[in-house]
Amino acid sequence: MLKYQLKNENGWMHRRLVRRKSDMERGEIWLVSLDPTAGHEQQGTRPVLIVTPAAFNRVTRLPVVVPVTSGGNFARTAGFAVSLDGVGIRTTGVVRCDQPRTIDMKARGGKRLERVPETIMNEVLGRLSTILT
């Protein structure tokens, strides 16, 4: 967030928070190129879900993301996937919680698409917690 002050016609100071185009928040889906990759990593230009909080992303400019795919059969059967179908957003497929990675969104030409519902974000964080702890 970018802070700035404004004076109104009476000379009063007001602070406003303005969201910068590059701000990245937990729960947002961005379209980004994941190439180059190696092995079984998700590749190509695809949606990713940001899982790190905005404060972390502002400081590091390197969010941790998980890819969204229309495939992911292994992740589905192993319980690592969270479905986005029928949750009221345009992006469809499954979130691959088994493939978190840190990316430089700016260098990869990332573009903000939309935000997932809080229930989906909580489910993704729960799956990540199970995998990482």
Swiss-Prot record:
GO terms for biological process: mRNA catabolic process; rRNA catabolic process. It holds the Pfam family PemK_toxin. Keywords: DNA-binding, Endonuclease, Hydrolase, Nuclease, Plasmid, RNA-binding, Toxin-antitoxin system. Its EC number is 3.1.-.-. The keyword Disulfide bond does not apply. One of its GO terms (molecular function) is RNA endonuclease activity. It is an enzyme of class 3 (hydrolase). It comes from the Bacteria. The keyword Lipid metabolism does not apply. Toxic component of a type II toxin-antitoxin (TA) system. Probably functions as an endoribonuclease. Responsible for the stable maintenance of the plasmid during cell division by postsegregational killing of plasmid-less daughter cells. Neutralized by coexpression with cognate antitoxin PemI. Both PemI and PemK proteins bind to the promoter region of the pem operon to autoregulate their synthesis. Belongs to the PemK/MazF family. Homodimer. This is Endoribonuclease PemK.
